[in-house]
């Protein structure tokens, strides 16, 4: 029997109702005469505390609260890709058609078009035994996504019967029935799954394959693996959103889930405007054909921010179970934590550090632990991954505040954005001294097998130059660069070249916005070759001024924008020209 109670107290998005003894934790309820969507978050006797996912203006004590008997769930099936949802998977385009620019309260519609037909190709036969997670057929969802129709994870299994033949069917069509353990279950193209419950899998693997983003400072210096976790904290104006947009655009994953959680609406609009016109570099198809957007902007109800994170990660796990690599980008987890803080305050809970609830760390852990590279449940065997990347917006760029410090406990890649770099127009403004990646050793083998076996040693050499430059900064600040010998002045010069020619990247330049792994390796090798040849030339008595005057330096610094990904021979020619120029200024051939 569904719980039925009455509102006794309203405080912003928090509502208290009595007569709810039949309710369960995290059960979805309808609140008030307007039937607003809410979720039970605490039970004390027959009193339920409910967070409401819509505006509670006008709610008053005495209005009914009715339980649905189900937890907050999302609909999973064909038609999700390319959609724009709010935090509880309501399609915003459909809602805008129904109610105009401002969404009315209590309006609901199906998350996908249930009447749209897809061409279903069965992969099982009548009489076959199936279990939870088995693929029974496929449909083509978009030009980029072949969508596997799977037996729901909570299915008990059984024999297939009444299987439809290949053809066009809508989502409500019963594709097959299963018979087992005395019950008959209908299988359709879609099923529902609770957002707070991770989807099951067979095995979990170590993340050993890099997620290539086309951003040099990430891929080369602080890489993230498929199935890994990363965080990008930074103060206001340091470029978090643009960096996350770049990852969402160019990451070599099959599906991208972009969650705008409590940020400006214009940032979601930018994604909606740009992505349909941008082409996937691997397939040439529009990027929206692989993207799902969950928009929960700063002026939307605060309670739905928490739900938006869980909605997004559940959709990501669904596509992971098809054997796809999924990237989930959350911008920003700080706004999500602020929503937790507001709800905690409304519920009069004891605050912890900076007013955040004491369970902030466990909620962050729940989210980041849903990342991973796994073998999906059922058959045939499918390997997929969910990579979680969360932005953090610490007030004033203070990385010691609770959200940043707790996040650092649960992630392995940390891209620290630096306001000084951003204000000096160095983008992406990832500080190479404060950032780190725990996946470097795991993915070095992939780079060695697929790009070049000396990738790790070159990366160490370039990073060593940046570290040595950092130690020399203090001397230069006190005594000036002229106090240094030529060998150390060369380090400063090469570090400058690394920053401009390798670390900096222009997201608005057609060539430089995406950099292939081969080009990243060649640019890094050019800089290391220049450094080694410069060292040898100085040992042989060549003045540093002659090295600084080389024309090859300008060409090398502009190569990131002048040389396209399919023009690698140009970089080989640049290396040869640099070799000749060193020969001319030293008078002897400098060995590699």
From Swiss-Prot:
Protein residues bound to ATP: 234-241
Gene3D superfamilies noted in UniProt: 2.40.30.20, 2.40.50.100, Bovine Mitochondrial F1-atpase, Atp Synthase Beta Chain, Chain D, domain 3, P-loop containing nucleotide triphosphate hydrolases
EC number: 7.1.2.2
Annotated catalysed reactions: ATP + H2O + 4 H(+)(in) = ADP + phosphate + 5 H(+)(out)
Pfam families, alphabetized: ATP-synt_ab, ATP-synt_ab_N, ATP-synt_ab_Xtn, ATP-synt_VA_C
Molecular-function GO term, any one: proton-transporting ATPase activity, rotational mechanism
UniProt membrane topology term: Peripheral membrane protein
GO cellular component: a single term: plasma membrane
Intracellular or extracellular location(s): Cell membrane
GO biological process: proton motive force-driven plasma membrane ATP synthesis; proton transmembrane transport
Its biological purpose: Component of the A-type ATP synthase that produces ATP from ADP in the presence of a proton gradient across the membrane. The A chain is the catalytic subunit.
Subunit description: Has multiple subunits with at least A(3), B(3), C, D, E, F, H, I and proteolipid K(x).
Annotated family: Belongs to the ATPase alpha/beta chains family.
HAMAP family in the cross-refs: ATP_synth_A_arch
The name this protein goes by in its record: A-type ATP synthase subunit A
Naturally occurring in which organism (per UniProt): Nitrosopumilus maritimus (strain SCM1)
Name of the gene encoding the protein in the UniProt record: atpA
């Amino acid at each position: 029997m569904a719980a039925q109670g009455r509102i006794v107290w309203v405080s912003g998005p928090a509502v208290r109702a009595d007569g709810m003894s039949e309710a369960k934790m995290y059960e979805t309820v309808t609140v008030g005469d307007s039937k607003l969507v809410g979720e039970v978050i605490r039970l004390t006797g027959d009193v339920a505390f409910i967070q409401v996912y819509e505006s509670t203006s006008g709610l008053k004590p005495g209005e009914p609260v009715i339980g649905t008997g189900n937890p907050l769930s999302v609909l999973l099936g064909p038609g999700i890709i390319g959609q724009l949802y709010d935090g509880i998977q309501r399609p915003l385009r459909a809602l805008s058609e129904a109610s105009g620019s401002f969404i009315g309260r209590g309006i609901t519609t199906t998350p996908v078009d249930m009447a749209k037909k897809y061409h279903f190709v069965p992969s099982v036969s009548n009489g076959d035994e199936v279990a939870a997670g088995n693929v029974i057929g496929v449909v083509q969802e978009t030009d980029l996504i072949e969508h596997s129709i799977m037996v729901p994870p909570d299915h008990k299994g059984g024999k297939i019967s009444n299987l439809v033949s290949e053809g066009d069917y809508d989502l409500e069509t019963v594709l097959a029935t299963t018979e087992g353990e005395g019950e008959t279950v209908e299988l359709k193209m879609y099923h529902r799954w609770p957002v707070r419950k991770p989807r099951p899998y067979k095995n979990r693997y170590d993340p050993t394959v890099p997620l290539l983003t086309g951003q040099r400072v990430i891929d080369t210096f602080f890489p993230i693996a498929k199935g890994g976790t990363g965080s990008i904290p930074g103060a206001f104006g340091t470029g978090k959103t643009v960096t996350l947009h770049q990852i969402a655009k160019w990451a070599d994953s099959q599906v991208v889930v972009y969650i705008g959680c409590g940020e400006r609406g214009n940032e979601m609009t930018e994604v909606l405007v740009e992505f349909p016109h941008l082409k996937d570099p691997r397939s040439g198809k529009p990027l929206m054909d692989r993207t799902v957007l969950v928009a929960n902007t700063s002026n939307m109800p605060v309670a739905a921010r928490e739900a938006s994170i869980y909605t997004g990660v559940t959709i990501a796990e669904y596509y992971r179970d098809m054997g796809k690599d999924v990237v989930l980008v959350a911008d920003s987890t700080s706004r999500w934590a602020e929503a937790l803080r507001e709800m905690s305050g409304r519920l009069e809970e004891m605050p912890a550090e900076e007013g955040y609830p004491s369970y902030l760390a466990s909620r962050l852990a729940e989210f980041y632990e849903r990342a991973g590279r796994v073998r999906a449940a059922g058959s045939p065997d499918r390997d997929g991954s969910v990579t979680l990347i969360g932005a953090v917006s610490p007030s004033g760029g203070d990385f010691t505040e609770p959200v940043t410090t707790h996040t650092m406990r649960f992630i392995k890649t940390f891209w620290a954005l630096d306001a000084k770099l951003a204000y000096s127009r160095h983008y992406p403004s990832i500080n190479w001294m404060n950032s780190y990646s725990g996946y470097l050793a795991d993915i070095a083998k992939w780079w060695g097998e697929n790009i070049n076996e000396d990738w790790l040693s070159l990366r160490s050499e370039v990073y060593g130059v940046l570290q040595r430059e950092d130690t020399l900064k203090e001397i230069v600040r006190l005594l000036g660069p002229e106090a240094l010998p030529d060998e150390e002045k060369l380090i400063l010069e090469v570090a400058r070249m690394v920053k401009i020619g390798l670390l900096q990247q222009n997201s608005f330049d057609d060539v430089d916005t995406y950099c292939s792994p081969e080009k990243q390796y060649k640019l890094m090798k050019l800089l290391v070759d220049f450094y080694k040849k410069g060292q040898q030339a100085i040992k042989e008595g060549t003045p540093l001024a002659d090295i600084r005057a080389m024309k090859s330096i300008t060409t090398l610094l502009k190569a990131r924008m002048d040389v396209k990904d399919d023009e690698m021979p140009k970089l080989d020619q640049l290396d040869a020209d640099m070799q000749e120029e060193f020969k001319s200024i030293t008078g002897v051939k400098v060995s590699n």
